[in-house]
Amino acid sequence: WFRQELGGGMSFDELTAEAAEAPPGSDGVLFLPYMAGERSPIWNPDAKGVFYGLSFDKTRGHLIRSVLEGVAFSLEHNLRTAAETGIHVDTLNAMGGASNSVLWTQIKADVTGKTIRVPSSDTATTLGAAILAGVGCGIYGSYGEAVNRTIRMTRVQEPNPENKAVYDRAMERYLRLYEDLKEGFSL
């Protein structure tokens, strides 16, 4: 959406390079990524996308980075909700187009505090189907064996503790911003 409407025809790589010019936390700019309502974990079909914290000293780079961070905050919100139910995740695997961005993957690692592994194959659906078939046909004795024998990592990104501290504060603002705006979304 951002690239199409505000990106001025720039490529994803160009937008990401511009985002890298803004510091972690986007100097206070937050983006709620609820462009089509939001499902898990808030389940609010009326939620809207929001840029917050704009001032004349902010650049398009701040906006781009805040979009990347907003998606990462949504991921962290889901991980926190899962943890409340006893599901704890230590490592994340990132696949698909967004995983091609080293910056965005690093932002997700920093926000969540989790190691993120990026496999060499970005055809997750096809590979997943092949793994299911391989286990079903007895080629592999278990899903764990199938994964260990078929998936190779291109890179592993560890969270940066300094950035994590910045993002922890921003995450609390992100959650509070949604709560403060929630009633207005249905107007």
What does each model-identified segment do?
Residues 1-187:
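Active-site core segments that coordinate phosphate-bearing ligands/cofactors
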